Amino acid sequence: MAVQKSRKSRSRRDMRRSHHRMEIAEISIDATTGEKHRRHHMTKDGFYRGRQLFKVSQDA
């Protein structure tokens, strides 16, 4: 197994982890319903880019 020669400093550790942050989700507002949804995802009503792709039942 590989064993490090010397301990890494907090600065080096944190610089390595600087890319591990959480990204903020891109939010869009649907033109037809005005509902907020994630980019490139359809809304809960079944609309995507102004067209209804699926008919969603109201049972759920």
From Swiss-Prot:
Residues 1-22 are annotated as: Disordered. GO terms for biological process: translation. One of its GO terms (molecular function) is structural constituent of ribosome. Keywords: Ribonucleoprotein, Ribosomal protein. InterPro entries: Ribosomal_bL32, Ribosomal_bL32_bact, Ribosomal_zn-bd. Residues 1-20 have a biased composition (Basic residues). GO terms for cellular component: large ribosomal subunit. Belongs to the bacterial ribosomal protein bL32 family. This is Large ribosomal subunit protein bL32.
